C-alpha cells in the first residue's frame, strides 16, 4: 500500500510586537526591515499599558502606521484582544486571550473571512472547544519563561505532539521562544512559533532573528 499522507508544512514565524513602542515611526522602519528579512506569516499587535491591560490608544496608533505596510508584505495582521479595533483598522483578524470575548462573538463581528485565534494555555479541552466554536488556530503555552506576559501557565511539548497527531486545526506555540530553544517545539509539531522578545531583542537585531528562525525551520522541515 502506498502511503498517501502529506508531509506537514514547515513551521512559520508568528511575530508579536513589543509590549510598548515609544517611537512609532522608528518602529515602522524597523518592522519593514524585519519583514523583508524572511518569511513571517503574521504580525500580532499586542501593546500593553503599565497596568498590563491592552493599550487601545497605542494599538490604534501603531496599527494605523503598520497594518497596510505589513499586509502589502504578505503578512496577516492580527490585533490582540480587540475585535472591534481590528475591524476599524482593516486588520486581518484578532487573537483572543483566555478571558476575552467568545470566538463566536468575534466571528459574528468580523465575518467569515477574518482570522480568529484563541489562547488555550495548556488545555487540550479549551483548544478543542475553541476549534468547535470556529477558531482558525489555537495557541498553546507558555513553553518557556517569558518576560513579555505575566501569569503564564507552563505547557509541555507533549501537548503539541498529541494535538498534531489528532487535529487538523493549526497550533501556535508561545512563551519565551528564541532561536536557541525553538527546535523542540518545531519537532513536536508547532505549526507556528509566536515570538516577541526573541526577535526584537536578538543580539544581532530583529532582521537577523527572522533569518535565523527561517533557517531553523528549513533545516527541520
Curated annotation (Swiss-Prot):
GO biological process, one term: thiamine diphosphate biosynthetic process
Domain of life: Bacteria
Pathway of action: Cofactor biosynthesis; thiamine diphosphate biosynthesis; thiamine phosphate from 4-amino-2-methyl-5-diphosphomethylpyrimidine and 4-methyl-5-(2-phosphoethyl)-thiazole: step 1/1
GO terms assigned for molecular function: magnesium ion binding; thiamine-phosphate diphosphorylase activity
Protein name listed in UniProt: Thiamine-phosphate synthase
Entries under SUPFAM superfamilies matching the protein: Thiamin phosphate synthase
Known EC number: 2.5.1.3
Gene Ontology cellular-component terms listed: cytoplasm
Gene: thiE
CDD domains, per database record: TMP_TenI
Database matches in NCBIfam families: thiE
Residues that, per the record, bind 2-[(2R,5Z)-2-carboxy-4-methylthiazol-5(2H)-ylidene]ethyl phosphate: 146-148, 176
Residue positions binding 4-amino-2-methyl-5-(diphosphooxymethyl)pyrimidine: 44-48, 80, 119, 149
